[in-house]
């Protein structure tokens, strides 16, 4: 029953429902992992800027919104990639795309274009260091920069680096 519901949700591109069904089943030790991680296409370039790989963008979407296009966070972030409206407006201008707050929660391609473009910009800002770009995407670059200046991030990075060796 759960696999059928998750499969139907996937077929009609309601990945958020497929994830919810799979999560409920996994709590009861019935796993339907192929529905927990939907696959859809993401842009390779947005106005000339190369975007990180499809799987990476999908992992951000999975974590941020669980593929719920209409997701709205308590902080005000919107859509699949959970963009703050002000950030989305700035990114739309940088990417030479029209800004529309309503499209953040109604147009998956638009939300993914803006979110991908924004993430790639953060990746450039942090010299290709994915953990920093991910942290900046999640908490905001100002917050991350403050933490870097406090040496907290350097200490955590050193521990992570030693652990990976």
Language-model features and meaning:
Residues 1-165:
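Catalytic glycan-binding domains that act on GlcNAc-containing polysaccharides
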């Amino acid at each position: 029953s759960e696999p059928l519901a998750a499969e139907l949700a996937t077929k009609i591109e309601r990945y958020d429902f497929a994830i919810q069904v799979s999560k409920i089943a996994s709590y009861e030790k019935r796993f339907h992992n192929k529905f927990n991680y939907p696959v859809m296409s993401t842009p390779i370039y947005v106005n000339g800027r190369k975007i990180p790989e499809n799987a990476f963008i999908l992992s951000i979407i999975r974590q941020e919104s669980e593929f719920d296009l209409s997701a709205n966070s308590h902080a005000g972030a919107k859509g699949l990639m959970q963009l703050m409206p002000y950030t989305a407006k700035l990114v739309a201008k940088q990417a030479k795309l029209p800004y529309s707050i309503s499209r953040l929660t109604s147009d998956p391609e638009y939300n993914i274009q803006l979110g991908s473009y924004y993430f790639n910009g953060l990746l450039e800002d942090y010299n290709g260091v994915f953990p920093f770009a991910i942290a900046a995407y999640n908490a905001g670059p100002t917050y991350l920069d403050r933490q870097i200046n406090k040496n907290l991030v350097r200490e955590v990075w050193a521990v992570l680096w030693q652990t990976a060796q």
